[in-house]
Amino acid sequence: MDSSNDEVLFVGTAEDEHVEMYLKAIWHIKERNESVKISTIARMLSVKQPSVVQMLKKLNQQQLVEYNKAGVFLTENGEKVGSHMMRNSRLMEVLMVSALKVEINEEMVCGIEHHMNKQFTNALCIMLNHPRKCPHNHTIPKGECCEKN
């Protein structure tokens, strides 16, 4: 069997997706100008508050958030990941509604957004003509491809 023709399958880690979901949730709460509370994150992600605390401690160690008695704040790197995830999500929603003419399926969007690299995201943004708002009328964070326009 010629191994050069074998299909290579990518298996992402659930841990990476959990990290991205937490950062996206925090980014979204911040976008709404609300203070980031453990209870709000738990409600958004349908998890228990102790799980949120455990993940925030992990994100704090990874320097993606600052988590202390003063609250929860995204670091510069955490902000980048959260913004990137929100951009992916909202561009996928625009693709579904505007280009594919299908109803938004949040479960599908969530499954895809974690696997979109910068090249794919920028190509999608260009194809969609750099949309500024998603179908829910939320701002889509700009990417490098938008800065050139």
Predicted feature descriptions by range:
Residues N60-A70:
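A short, conserved structural fragment
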Residues P50:
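Key DNA-contact positions within bacterial/archaeal DNA-binding proteins
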Residues A70-N88:
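Basic, amphipathic "hinge/linker" alpha-helix immediately C-terminal to the N-terminal HTH DNA-binding motif
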Residues R32-A42:
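Short acidic, hydrophobic short linear motifs in intrinsically disordered regions
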Residues L56-K57:
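Short, hydrophobic-biased segments on the C-terminal half of alpha helices
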Residues G111-N149:
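C-terminal regulatory/oligomerization modules of transcriptional regulators
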Residues M1-K24:
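Short alpha-helical segments that sit at the start of domains
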